[in-house]
Amino acid sequence: MQERQDTGSDAAFTGASSNNQLVAAANPLLNAIPQIRHSVSHDDQVALRQRLIDEIRRFEVRCQQAGLPYEVIVGARYCLCTALDEAAALTPWGSSGVWSSNGLLVTFHNETWGGEKFFQLLARLSQNPREHILLLEMINYCLLLGFEGRYRVLDNGRTQLETIKQRLWQMIRGVRGSYPPPLSP
């Protein structure tokens, strides 16, 4: 996060964040995903990790102030930690040091890899999209910003992931109606 790169991700949040308090509260963390993913080096990983921990705590406060249910906040936090950890792990600097042993998912959920559970959560929430639309939209943005989880390493994983993204977008449109799909970086 040394320097901000324009990946178009800010534009991705316009549609949903105006209708979705969860996405609006998560914007700083969602915006950090491409910033981290595209950074070639980071001089102070410990400080970056602490800034993200502090921002996750602010996210939780914003969600509580908005009256969002605890389960939604925890689910969103899990997905955000997983996406941020993956973004860091895929950088030249993130595969060693702070993130290799003490990612955000470990800090907040005492887990080391959420690449499977992220999609299990998506499958569960997809059973009742109207009830879970806020979190489904936030998951959609994590995917649009490049999160791949277990599909990164599976044979034909990217094709499977594209199918998941398409189904998720159709589900969201089914609940929200038509508005232009968000831009993907």
Model-flagged regions — what are they?
Residues 74, 79-151:
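Membrane-proximal low-complexity regions enriched in glycine and acidic/polar residues
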Residues 17, 44, 68, 106, ...:
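Conserved aromatic-histidine-acidic binding/catalytic patches
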Residues 35, 39, 58-69, 82-93, ...:
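Amphipathic alpha-helical interaction surfaces
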Residues 2-86:
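Non-catalytic, solvent-exposed interaction/assembly segments
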Residues 162-185:
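Juxtamembrane amphipathic/hinge helix adjacent to a transmembrane helix
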Residues 150-162:
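Charge-enriched, short contiguous segments at helix-coil
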